[in-house]
Each structure stands twice: as structure tokens, then as C-alpha cells.
Amino acid sequence: MTDRLKCLIWYCIDNQNYDNSIFYSERLHAIEDSNESLYLLAYSHFLNLDYNIVYDLLDRVISHVPCTYLFARTSLILGRYKQGISAVEACRSNWRSIQPNINDSISSRGHPDASCMLDVLGTMYKKAGFLKKATDCFVEAVSINPYNFSAFQNLTAIGVPLDANNVFVIPPYLTAMKGFEKSQTNATASVPEPSFLKKSKESSSSSNKFSVSESIANSYSNSSISAFTKWFDRVDASELPGSEKERHQSLKLQSQSQTSKNLLAFNDAQKADSNNRDTSLKSHFVEPRTQALRPGARLTYKLREARSSKRGESTPQSFREEDNNLMELLKLFGKGVYLLAQYKLREALNCFQSLPIEQQNTPFVLAKLGITYFELVDYEKSEEVFQKLRDLSPSRVKDMEVFSTALWHLQKSVPLSYLAHETLETNPYSPESWCILANCFSLQREHSQALKCINRAIQLDPTFEYAYTLQGHEHSANEEYEKSKTSFRKAIRVNVRHYNAWYGLGMVYLKTGRNDQADFHFQRAAEINPNNSVLITCIGMIYERCKDYKKALDFYDRACKLDEKSSLARFKKAKVLILLHDHDKALVELEQLKAIAPDEANVHFLLGKIFKQMRKKNLALKHFTIAWNLDGKATHIIKESIENLDIPEENLLTETGEIYRNLET
């Protein structure tokens, strides 16, 4: 498998697909912990402008010349001259006798093939909002080359139904090749039928092989957004993500940043090259990707010779065996990524955990696990996994905005502040860093400062949907509901499957009393992520407001089954049971809730109410007293209930004021 992985890594590097080269380099380094595999991983990160990650990877490598040279180049960019000099001087005896290799063969270097061109074309279509065309491009890219993992991830992000078992199969034209170094001329003439698309009843009879992808893309790009046309039309075009105004601001920022010694130049000609870098819609400042950029061009000839000699020793049969093994591994990765994109979280978790242990301990898998636990609302476990990722790759900023949100939910201000400090120090031009800082200010209820940080993040990347969603929540916290709705709509324009923005719009309408609009947006979010207990609870809240208690109870019960530890869903369920005069079942729910949230005054207050109604005065007094001790602000309500302990109440939920605030929001 290692030979095939090395071929794939160089193939990805030749085609400037650095996300894929990082992905395969991680797989190789997990299997073969050697200087060569470490160099390939570091070199891929270097080409991806992840200089701090390169520095961390190569900091302790002593005698390997290519690694030392790459470390020196990285130290030069980061301004850490002393460390670079020490590393180069330490292995002087190893590189002093190396002769220039000007006549090194370039026959193994290739040009972008159809799959690479389709991948970058699809990425541009996706960023421009043409999801149907983007889907067609990605489908064809994966059909031509199943090793194109970034195209596969783009398909999962769009929401196309896929079957990973049928995606990651060796195409016929590849089985006749000894390796990737042979020409692939006319390879597209034998493009396999994209059988990996899951057929729906509506599209199974269609003769167009891309009919499924068209229907999926259209469902998100047209029907789902049509109801919001009038709202989007009201938004000033200059404020929309990716508008001329913001692109001008972004270019201005890039121009200003040239004075930084650690920041490289950026120009318009490189935009197309940067579009194929990441499906998470981030932007970075990049430098020209020319052959002169390659820092190891002279010192990696030994690696290339070793690679060529290994190819000479490898037989077509051995390559086929490696391809088969690698495809089995990719099927597991593909299933996990697809299931996570579909929010089938338990299945995704099982899939990632079924990977070989060395693969589980790589940044890619740890990030996916952290996101999976986060979506499962298991913030403690998510924090644990993300912290492991931070220990493994301390300079990584990708996906750290999810980590910061988990810390925000856990109310852990110190770790969140530390994370914000570290990410800003190592990645000051990353939008994720500024969103993390915004979460830090938000936790301190400094919403104005948080909004300033978010605006900076949007300047750096006008297509970062998380920033718009966070901006919407901060405006909502300031009761600026119109601005909040505008921000959430911008997030949806960037990514129509970003369910958090649909949820945010629903909450704004819920707060402003527009129950029908709130229900529509919650339902839309739940269509994207049907396994989120919070969304199901919010739909139940709409029915509760409309006094349809039985329907509300159905949704609360479903939410409790999705997340047994959801205090909000269980509390709402108990309240509805009380409204239906089913006090015994309500008591059971509250007892379970007490075990989940023993320090929640609301729970004890409601328990006291029920015991009072059941004429169990001692238990009622006990829980009223506990509630009093836990929430001193609600003493007037609790005191009144204690004073009227002998007077039965017709409606136990008449007093739903201050004491319910924590669980109601």
C-alpha cells in the first residue's frame, strides 16, 4: 500500500491538490513512520501554506537532509532564524557532499488531468452558487478518478446521496497501468458509469446518468431557497457574501498585509488556484505555485530515485494488491465522511472508530470525531477529542471554531481564552481564529466586541458561513433581530445545507412571536439534520405555543429518545405532561432530569409544585428549599409557593417567569 500512497501523494502535488496530498500523506505516515513519509506530510502542508504545522512536524528531525532543508525554509518564512541555522548546521556533514542534480528526469511529472480540472471547476461552481453544475463536475471527477477524495467530500457537503462501496473501486483503465507515471491519454473515453449515486424512485427511470445529482442540487439551489427570494432581494447587494464590495475589501486587506514579514503576496491570478483547496469554504493568502517554489526540488532527488527504483521492482500484481487494500481503507473513510455529512452520527462514529488505530490518531480523523461528538451534543467528549487533536497538531486552525463552540457551551472561559490566544498568534489571517476570539467575547457577554471580531473574519473570508451564523446569534443577543435575520440569510446563501443558520432564523421568529415562520425554519433545519434533539424540541415548542400539547409531547418524546441527556427536551416534556394533568409521568421525567441537572433550580421548583399538588408537603417543602438555595433571584416566587403550601393550585405552570429562564432559552 505504501508505494501506491507515495504515487498518489506526488500525483496530488503535481496537480496542486494539496488537501488530497495532506490526506494521503497522513495515511502513509500512520502506516510507515519514517523520515520520508514525514517529509511528504510536511511538504504537503508547506505547499498548503501551513507553515506552523510544518515547523511543528520537523522541529525534532535532526539528520534527514530534505526535512532539514524544508525546516530551514519554513524557519525563514516564520522569522525563526536561530532555529533554522541550528538545524542546518547540525547536519552539515550530511548535505555537504551532495552534488547538483540538474539533469534529473522530469518524465514522471504530469499535467492536470480531467479529474483535477473537473474538481477545480466544480469548486468554482460551488462557490458561485451553481450547485447543479458543481454536482455534475464532482460526480464526473470521482467517476474518472476514485482517488479524488476532495471531490468526494464536496459531493457529501452538497448533500448528494452516495454509496461509498461503489465510489471507491479501481477503474478499468487503471488496472492496466503499472503505476501513475504512465500516460493517461484518452482516459476519459472509458469513464465508468457513476453507479455510486443512490437512485431515488423519481429519478431511477431517467436516462441521464447525472439526473440524480441534478435533482439533489436543484432541491437545494432552487426550491429550498425560493421561499426566501423576497427577503434576499431586500438585502443590499453590497452586503451579500462574495459581493464586489467585499471582494474589493478582501483584496485591499491582502495588499495591506504585504508589509508583514510572515505573510506572502497574493494576486488576482492565484484566485483560481486557491479555489480547489478546501471544501470548508476557507480562504488563505497564497503565493504563486510555480516550480521554483518547491523547496526540496534539489534535495528530494534521492526520494524520487528511491521511488523510481521501487516502481521498477513492483509488479502490476503488487500494485493491484496495494490498490485493493487502499480502496478498502478509502471506503471506510468515505462512509464516515458521508454519514457525518448526512448527520447519521452514531453510524459515522462507528465507522471512524472501525479504522485502524494508527489512522484514528491522525488529525483528519480526530477532527471528524470531534465534530461528530459535537453534533451529538456530547460537548465533554468533543472537547476531549479536540484537545487530543491540539496536542497532536498545535498549529492547526481548521475545525477549531467547532472546538471553541463546544467550549462556549461548556462555559469554559479559561480554555476558550487560551485557544483564542494560541490560534491568533499562529494564524492571525485565518477567519477561524477571529471566530474563536468572538466566541470568547460572547461567553463574557461582550457582544459588541464579538461582532467586531466576526466582521474581521468575514473580511478575511466572505464565504465562511460559520462567521455569518455567529454574527446572527450575536445580533440576536443584542435584540437586533433584523440584522440577525440578514446574517443568517447570508449564511444560507453561502451554504444552503448549513442547518445552524436555518435554526437561527427560527429562533429569531420564535422570539418575535411569528410562530408560523419559526416552524417553517425549524422544519427546514430538521430536514437537513433530522437527528438533532434541539431542533426537534424547538418544533415541539411551536406546537406547545399553539396549545397543541399532544403534538408537542410527541416531538419532546422524540427529542428525548434522540438525546437522553437533553435537559431542555426532558424539561419541556415534563411541563407538557403537567399541562395534560399527567402528574405521575411528569414526576418520572423530573426525577430523571434531576439526575442529569441536579443543580437546576427549575427542576426542584417544579418537583415542589407537583408534590404540593399530590399533598406530599414534606417533599414539596424539601424541593422548594433546594430551589431557593440554588436560585436566590427567584426567592419571591418560591417564598409565595411555600407560604401557600396548603392551598391547592389549579394550574401549576402559572408562574413561568424568572425561575424558568435557564431552561427556557
UniProtKB/Swiss-Prot annotation:
Main location: nucleus
Keywords: Cell cycle, Cell division, Mitosis, Nucleus, Repeat, TPR repeat, Ubl conjugation pathway
Record keyword Phosphoprotein present: no
Domain of life: Eukaryota
Stored Pfam families: ANAPC3, TPR_1, TPR_19, TPR_8
DNA-binding region(s) in UniProt: 191-257
One Gene Ontology MF term: DNA binding
GO terms classed as biological process: anaphase-promoting complex-dependent catabolic process; cell cycle switching, mitotic to meiotic cell cycle; cell division; metaphase/anaphase transition of mitotic cell cycle; mitotic sister chromatid segregation; mitotic sister chromatid separation; protein ubiquitination
Signal peptide: none
Protein localization: Nucleus
GO cellular component: anaphase-promoting complex; cell division site; cytoplasm; nucleus
TPR repeats: 115-148, 329-362, 363-396, 431-464, 466-498, 499-532, 534-566, 568-600, 601-634
InterPro entries, sorted: TPR-like_helical_dom_sf (IPR011990), TPR_rpt (IPR019734)
Protein family (similarity comment): Belongs to the APC3/CDC27 family.
Subunit annotation: The APC/C is composed of at least 13 subunits: apc1, apc2, nuc2, apc4, apc5, cut9, apc8, apc10, apc11, hcn1, apc13, apc14 and apc15. Interacts with apc10 and cut9.
Purpose: Component of the anaphase-promoting complex/cyclosome (APC/C), a cell cycle-regulated E3 ubiquitin-protein ligase complex that controls progression through mitosis and the G1 phase of the cell cycle. The APC/C is thought to confer substrate specificity and, in the presence of ubiquitin-conjugating E2 enzymes, it catalyzes the formation of protein-ubiquitin conjugates that are subsequently degraded by the 26S proteasome.
Name of the molecule in the record: Anaphase-promoting complex subunit 3
Source organism (scientific name): Schizosaccharomyces pombe (strain 972 / ATCC 24843) (Fission yeast)
Classification lineage: Eukaryota, Fungi, Dikarya, Ascomycota, Taphrinomycotina
Gene it is expressed from: nuc2
